[in-house]
Amino acid sequence: MKTALVTGGAGLIGSHIVDGALAAGWDVRILDNLQRQTHREGKPDWVPGEAEFIQGDVRNRRTWERALDGIAVVFHQAAYGGYMPEIAKFIDSNGVGTALLLETIRDKNLPVRKVVVASSQAVYNEGAYRCPEH
């Protein structure tokens, strides 16, 4: 059986990827830090019991080593969505976390076949906004 890792798998987009991978017959492992700003009540009810769940930080190399064990495909959705005024936190979580993912695969010579890095809900923002020109 093929195993997919979905980082940020407890989040909005990641949870849909988890559902789709399970429906397609994949084994799924979720890596999510359950950041309090997003998950005030802890692990959400929509996280499926048949998916393995690791609570961890993408900025930790040991977390990556554990999460990537036996993985064929990574869907990398973990991201810190806020950026102002915490630009350093944004770069640390999103940039360094992704770099550690790729370094861990390379350094451990892991047989990961694909890494899918997609955008997040940040591209369409939150709430209703009006454009003065349209």
Task: Give the residues covered by each predicted segment.
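N-terminal Rossmann-like NAD(P)+-binding domain of SDR-like oxidoreductases, especially those catalyzing
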Residues: 1-134
